[in-house]
């Protein structure tokens, strides 16, 4: 079960950093068909 906790923490941290950068610097070019 430790692996599940570590994975959850890792995804959560990456998600927070991603959203922080995304909202801090809006993309200057429109992203289409890119996930």
UniProtKB/Swiss-Prot annotation:
Biological process terms in GO annotation: photosynthesis
A GO cellular component annotation in the UniProt record: chloroplast thylakoid membrane
Localisation: Plastid, Chloroplast thylakoid membrane
Membrane topology reported for the UniProt record: Single-pass membrane protein
Residues annotated as transmembrane: 3-23
Keywords: Chloroplast, Membrane, Photosynthesis, Photosystem II, Plastid, Thylakoid, Transmembrane, Transmembrane helix
InterPro entries for this protein: PSII_PsbT (IPR001743), PSII_PsbT_sf (IPR037268)
Main location: plastid
Function: Found at the monomer-monomer interface of the photosystem II (PS II) dimer, plays a role in assembly and dimerization of PSII. PSII is a light-driven water plastoquinone oxidoreductase, using light energy to abstract electrons from H(2)O, generating a proton gradient subsequently used for ATP formation.
Quaternary structure note: PSII is composed of 1 copy each of membrane proteins PsbA, PsbB, PsbC, PsbD, PsbE, PsbF, PsbH, PsbI, PsbJ, PsbK, PsbL, PsbM, PsbT, PsbY, PsbZ, Psb30/Ycf12, at least 3 peripheral proteins of the oxygen-evolving complex and a large number of cofactors. It forms dimeric complexes.
Similarity-based family: Belongs to the PsbT family.
HAMAP family: PSII_PsbT
The protein's name in its UniProt record: Photosystem II reaction center protein T
Species of origin: Staurastrum punctulatum (Green alga)
């Amino acid at each position: 079960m430790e692996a599940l906790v570590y994975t959850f923490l890792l995804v959560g941290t990456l998600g927070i950093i991603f959203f922080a950068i995304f909202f801090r610097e809006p993309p200057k070019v429109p992203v289409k068909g890119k996930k």
